[in-house]
From Swiss-Prot:
Pathway: Amino-acid degradation; L-arginine degradation via AST pathway; L-glutamate and succinate from L-arginine: step 5/5
Entry's family note: Belongs to the AspA/AstE family. Succinylglutamate desuccinylase subfamily.
EC number: 3.5.1.96
Catalytic activity: N-succinyl-L-glutamate + H2O = L-glutamate + succinate
Cofactor dependence: Zn(2+)
Protein name: Succinylglutamate desuccinylase
A biological process term (GO) from this entry: arginine catabolic process to succinate
Active site: E222
Function of the molecule: Transforms N(2)-succinylglutamate into succinate and glutamate.
Amino acid sequence: MLSDLMINRDFLAYTLANPNQLPAAYDFMLADHTRVDVWDTGVIVFTPANATKDIVLSCAVHGNETAPIEICNQLIKDLLSQRIIAKQRVMFLIGNPTAILNKTRFIDENMNRLFSGAHSKGEGLSHPERHRAKALEQYVADFFNANSDNQRIHYDLHTAIRASKHEKFAIYPYRPGRAFSGEQIMFLAACGVDTMLFHHEPTTTFSYYSSQQFQADAFTVELGKVMPFGQNDMSRFAQTHTMLEKLITETKLAPVEFDPSKVNLYKVSRSINKHFDDFEFSFAGDAENFSAFSQGEVLATEGGNAIIVEYPQEAIVFPNANVPIGQRTVLCLVPAPNESIL
């Protein structure tokens, strides 16, 4: 197994050759004295001595979001080849290998709705993606629980289904009683992620799980638009790759003071769920994320009723009418100039 991985140091290829599971977990040491643990298919941990941060970089929770997969695979390859040397402990997760092979967002169910125990509710552990979500939760728990003093960070990397007026943006999970981190917002801005959405309620996303369970600085990070493998312009992700490499390989990053002029800040005003099969948006199917609508405009109709804009202006992200009844169809946003940011 080790020889298979180290021949090309291509962890993605190794994962896709073993999409369901590995025969056994194993570990080895690099010449730079970094310990490498392969816990499962798509799960690899690098542990140097004297780390002060525990970092989770996850990708492919949706299998067709290829740019984050390519970014993570290159970082893993560079660590395995020792082109770069880890100074911080980092776990990479390739979330849904079978969906990658299928070239689809998911096989049976949207995995980013299955965390914080949602995998075992309703129909229970009824298909592989629910089992995988449960396993990923446990790997994150094992990783973070190994240290109590280190800073905990989780960037769950995605690309969006549709184009966006702000190409790169992040969702800051709901964290009652905890201020938002200006340092983290500025780090993401340096990654090219210049737009932040502050969520208003608990969710069942991967980033919320890490934030809520382990008080991690956790984010869902959207890096652009979904493209097939081989069609990503990786120059558009150069800032992200550079900053993630710095995060892993530097003992301490120079702090950057929060500057609201460098970022676009929104908060979620409401989440609109689907209640009837006839749910239909009133705007064009190719409307970009962050398209804005004025108070009184009709956003959608369902069950004979109109859903209208409630604020002077609301922007929308992640519109998707083709979800099961009870699930979210869209997030509505308003400007957030006064959030508690330290």
